[in-house]
Amino acid sequence: MSEALAVLPDDTFTREQAEVVAAQYTNVAIEDDQGAHFRLVVRQNGEMVWRTWNFEPGGTYWLNRYIADYGIRKPQ
């Protein structure tokens, strides 16, 4: 039985939420870290396919979909 994947909330997100999601994938990472503000980035073959600042209202709508489509799960 597979474990449920953590996803980001529908609005802004915290560093803790971003770290939990990024820890599940090899190609999702926190970048442009400025302390309180940072981006969660999805890459494919090294190329960025989507990114969202943690403070963007509603920014996770597309980010969650790109993670679902392009995210490469880490081996468990």
UniProtKB/Swiss-Prot annotation:
Gene3D superfamilies: ykff protein like domains. Signal peptide: none annotated. The keyword Metal-binding does not apply. InterPro entries: DUF905, YkfF-like_sf. The keyword Manganese does not apply. Pfam families: DUF905. Keywords: Plasmid. It comes from the Bacteria. Disulfide bonds: none annotated. Belongs to the UPF0401 family. This is UPF0401 protein YubL.
